[in-house]
Structure formats: structure tokens, C-alpha cells
Amino acid sequence: MQAYFEQIEKVRYEGSQSDNPFAFRHYNPDQEILGKRMADHLRFAVAYWHTFCWNGADMFGVGSFARPWQQSGDALELAKRKADIAFEFFQKLSVPYYCFHDVDIAPEGNSLKEYLHNFAVITDVLAEKQQDSGVKLLWGTANCFTHPRYGAGAATNPDPDVFAWAATQVFTAMNATKKLGGENYVLWGGREGYETLLNTDLRQEREQIGRFMQMVVEHKHKIGFQGTLLIEPKPQEPTKHQYDYDVATVYGFLKQFGLEKEIKVNVEANHATLAGHSFHHEIATAVALGVFGSVDANRGDPQLGWDTDQFPNSVEENTLIMYEILKAGGFTTGGLNFDAKVRRQSTDRYDLFHAHIGAMDTMALALKAAARMIEDDKLNQLVAKRYAGWNGELGQQILQGKASLESLAHYAESHQLAPQHQSGQQELLENLVNRHLYPK
């Protein structure tokens, strides 16, 4: 097979002084950070959909890329060619993982029978390529939002036949993910929401999607899938309002249906932007609620109101992300999936390398800065000092349920309390962060 990226042999670490645009300047996979290899901290993955399925089309223009697997011809053979090139890319980029939707890797066909056949064929192709290359599957998922049948949602659709079709896709994709050794399975409700409340029964749709997720959990245990189930929050787009709005909303949903011990979250930076949150907020919230699982590493444009899915390039933003992840003990089954696409004008095939190399270097720099913050521990100490009172007798009585409003009122009166505000020292904390971002 002729190489598609014939100008590149393999992307390697060459250090910060390198001028080679096809080399890592900061991502050194074998460098030890806090007792663990950098590669094991970051667990990078390439997104099959944006990298190999998007053709450069947007709302105002047709596709601008000329990818050989996107030409006319036998759909299944083109899917095999796409897999060849995808694994060439993974290996030359030296990335350990990839992620996919079912219809990213295999043509959907014109019937359920064709879908199942095509998916089975390509699953076998990917299994062989994983065996040959050592590249692994971080997570799989099913696309239950693109086809016109899902115009009113999948699990929340008013037609139970559509619900059943979606269940078939998820059933098949979960089985394929298990077969391929996937470490997670993701559920993103692209159209699980509404465009108008005039034709929407909120209670009915919530019960439907709750039952759907319960069935997903049941199937996970039935087939013995050892990976983590993940829901990916997003507030809107393509619908006006989506039920998995943000991390806190997803947690409330999981609690309602008794799933908070079964499902975690896959947090995407750009989705946090759309929800009016910082990426830092969503990661910290997921950690605080005990549902942090994985990350879609990208960025949005604060001046635009849609999901731009750009590659991450802010060391400042991502240092705080990696700091939260390190404090929480790091990834277990999750990782950093680049749910990002090159710009429509970036039509050179090698732009795919520039995008991923830059993003991987960005996250490597962020990891190193976050590790310095962990080792220094001053930020953590200042936060602990701020809440130290809660470790005392009064604080513990309150938290342990041994105090009431009445007893606290008596305490305040008998001790003639006159508490004074203590400085939050935000500026000092920001200076501490900058000290580790720019150590020289």
C-alpha cells in the first residue's frame, strides 16, 4: 500500500530548540513527571470523525478537502482505505489511542442489514490494524444524531421505532468497542433536547432517555464490558436546548435514575464555553461530584456562538485543567481526545500533523506547569488554610449532622460571635499560577 503521508516517517521529540515543524518540542512521551511517563499522564487520542470524515464543508460552502477516501466509489472499500490512512497517521504521529463513532468507520448503507454487515467488516479490519500497530481504542460511540430519522432525537424521540433503531446502533457499537478493547464507551445526546416546547413533553422525554441509559448500563454488565460509560455534556447545537446541558445537569439526571455510580462524564472544552462556563469549572465540578472520566481537548471561540472545535493552544487554560486532573489522581480509563478539526482553509494533508503536534505540545507544557504547582503545594496549602475552620469542633459538628439551626443560634449568642471577613487573596493565587507557567 502506498503511503498517503509519504513525506513523514515518524514524529519524534527533538526538544524546545528544534525548528522542525514535524517534531515535538515539548511532548516527550518517556519523560517522567511525578513518577509517571508523560504519555501515561496524557493518554492522547485522535478523533476519527474530524480528522478523517469531515470534508471541509460548512453552512455556507461545500467541502474544501480532497481526501482520496471521500471520492465516489464502493463505500466499503473506501472505508477500508480510510482505515489504512488513519492508522498510518496514528503511527507516524506516535499517538497511543483513537476514538470513533460507528458511521465514522463504516458506511451506514441503505438498511439495517447493510449497516450491521458494514460495521462488522470494518470492526474486523480495525482489530487487525490495532494488533499490527499497537494503537488502542480509547472509546467508541454511536452516531444517533446525523441521520434524518433522528430529527426529533434518538432516545427522546416521540416514535418508539426510532428509539429501537438507536438502541440497535448503541448495542452494536458497544459490542464492537468491547471487541476492540475500548477503555470507555461514550454517549453524546446530539439531538436529545428540543427546538420548541410547544410540541415537547419534557417529563415523557426525560423518562425515555433515563430508561435508555439504564439499558446501556444493563448491557454493559451483560457483555462484561470492563470500560467506563461516559456521557458528554453539551447545552445546545444542534437543538435549542439539550438535556445534558452541563456537568451539574448530567449529575442531577444520573441521580434521578440511580446511575451516578455507573456513568461518568466526558468533558469537552468547547461545550463548556457554550454552556457559559470555563473549561476549568466543568472539570473541577466533575471531580467534585465524583464523575470525572475523560476529556475532549479542544477550544471554542468566545466571539462565536457555535462549536468551532479548534485545537487547544492555550497553555494557561490547560494548566489549570491538568492541575485539577492531577489533584484527582490522574486519568484511569480516560484520556485527552482531540475532538478538533483543522480550519476549512487548511487544505494541505500535512496540516493534520501541524494541528495535532501543536496540541500535544500545548498539553505537555500544561502538564509540566501543573506538576510544578502540585510539587510546590502552595496553592493547595492556601486553599486548605481558607477552610481550616471546618476541621475544628464547630465545623465538624455541623458537617456530621450534630448541629441544628437552634443550636447554632444558641452558640452564636453565647459566644457573642462577631466574625470578620478574611481575604480571598485571589491576586496572590493568580501570581502563584503565573510563577509556574513562566518559571524563568
Swiss-Prot record:
Q: Which PANTHER family match?
A: PTHR48408, XYLOSE ISOMERASE
Q: What does the entry's cofactor note say about binding and number?
A: Binds 2 magnesium ions per subunit.
Organism in which the protein naturally occurs? Pectobacterium carotovorum subsp. carotovorum (strain PC1)
Tell me which GO cellular component terms the UniProt record holds: cytoplasm
Q: Which family does it belong to?
A: Belongs to the xylose isomerase family.
Gene Ontology molecular function: any one? xylose isomerase activity
- Gene3D superfamilies on file: Divalent-metal-dependent TIM barrel enzymes
Give the matching InterPro entries. Answer: Xyl_isomerase-like_sf, Xylose_isom_bac, Xylose_isomerase
Q: Which UniProt keywords apply?
A: Carbohydrate metabolism, Cytoplasm, Isomerase, Magnesium, Metal-binding, Xylose metabolism
Enzyme Commission numbers on file: 5.3.1.5
Q: Which cofactor does it need?
A: Mg(2+)
Q: Which GO terms describe its biological process?
A: D-xylose metabolic process
Q: Which reaction does it catalyse?
A: alpha-D-xylose = alpha-D-xylulofuranose
Assembly notes: Homotetramer.
Gene that codes for this? xylA
Residues noted as binding Mg(2+) in the record, renumbered to the chain: D307, D309
Family matches, as NCBIfam families:
PRK05474.1 (NF003998), xylose_isom_A (TIGR02630)
Question: What superkingdom heads the lineage?
Answer: Bacteria
Query: Where is this gene product found?
Result: Cytoplasm
Cytoplasm found in the keyword field: yes
Q: What protein name is recorded for this chain?
A: Xylose isomerase
